[in-house]
Amino acid sequence: MEQFRNIGIIGRLGSSQVLDTIRRLKKFLLDRHLHVILEDTIAEVLPGHGLQTSTRKLLGEVCDLVIVVGGDGSLLGAARALARHNIPVLGINRGNLGFLTDIRPDELEEKVAQVLDGHYLVENRFLLQAEVRRHHEAIGQGDALNDVVLHPGKSTRMIEFEIYIDGQFVCSQKADGLIVATPTGSTAYALSAGGPIMHPKLDAIVIVPMYPHTLSGRPIVVDGNSELKIVVSKDLQIYPQVSCDGQNHFTCAPGDTITVSKKPQKLRLIHPLDHNYYEVCRTKLGWGSRLGSRDD
């Protein structure tokens, strides 16, 4: 296992709890005589930190490991910036669900110490890359760890579009939108829209229609190496949007084409050795616990 010496820290802004956790993490890492680098935006709200700072983009070039303190949204943003550097990312949960940031603040020192001592699991999570084209010219590009979503934006009208997979026509749909999700994103927006839960090790993509205007509109799971093309109807009266992880947005026009495929670079997500995906689902989604013993 890799030994980490240069540790980057990214944190969610606007939370005193995040700042308190970062202070604890900083002290813990410095006590182990490690080189700690703060993302510049979080460094601005930590006066007197005395540490080297870096932009998020450059953290991937100077660090062996990046620790994200925040919720899943914080890790999504970090993943898109760091995946191309092949740098491992570890999450400490200061958000809500915490599917990706799975270390609790109360176990920070214990779990981070295990990782630093080489006792950890590595998961390679693939991202999606999306491109919006108008008259054969790219007008917007973005990456997503969770999902790429076509939606009506501020309008309440339905969208009509065609779906192609690897150049083959699949169907046309009239719906509130369309979600294209990775296995990582299958427990996010896609799940709320009725999509299946996919184990993160699966090499697959799920296509989930949002409130389709037909009883036959159902999610489709396709090979992870597929290229998806969504063609917005030329007769559409609104300008829908494409969102990547709900954080990057592009406005489409009638007739635009959205291409979605797997990004070559993957996120290296670090977990403690006792990480259990099904336990995470059971805890976060409220699944039933073990049946009690019976006196037969």
Curated annotation (Swiss-Prot):
Originating species: Pseudomonas putida (strain GB-1)
Encoded by which gene? nadK
Recorded catalytic activity of this chain's protein: NAD(+) + ATP = ADP + NADP(+) + H(+)
* GO molecular function annotations of the record: ATP binding; metal ion binding; NAD binding; NAD+ kinase activity
Q: What cellular-component terms does GO give this entry?
A: cytoplasm
Xref: SUPFAM superfamilies: NAD kinase/diacylglycerol kinase-like
Membrane-spanning parts: none
Q: Which family does it belong to?
A: Belongs to the NAD kinase family.
Q: Where does NAD(+) bind?
A: 72-73, 146-147, 157, 174, 176, 187-192, 247
InterPro entries from the UniProt entry = ATP-NAD_kinase_N (IPR017438), ATP-NAD_kinase_PpnK-typ_C (IPR017437), NAD/diacylglycerol_kinase_sf (IPR016064), NADK (IPR002504)
PANTHER family linked to this entry: NAD KINASE
Which cofactors, by name? Answer: a divalent metal cation
Pfam families to which the protein is assigned, alphabetical:
NAD_kinase (PF01513), NAD_kinase_C (PF20143)
Q: Which UniProt keywords apply?
A: ATP-binding, Cytoplasm, Kinase, NAD, NADP, Nucleotide-binding, Transferase
Q: Subcellular localization, per the record? A: Cytoplasm
Q: Which residues form the active site?
A: 72
This one is known as NAD kinase
**What's its EC?**
2.7.1.23
Tell me, what does this protein do in biology?
Involved in the regulation of the intracellular balance of NAD and NADP, and is a key enzyme in the biosynthesis of NADP. Catalyzes specifically the phosphorylation on 2'-hydroxyl of the adenosine moiety of NAD to yield NADP.
HAMAP family, from UniProt?
Answer: NAD_kinase
What top-level class of enzyme does the UniProt entry assign? Answer: transferase
| GO BP of this protein | NAD metabolic process; NADP biosynthetic process
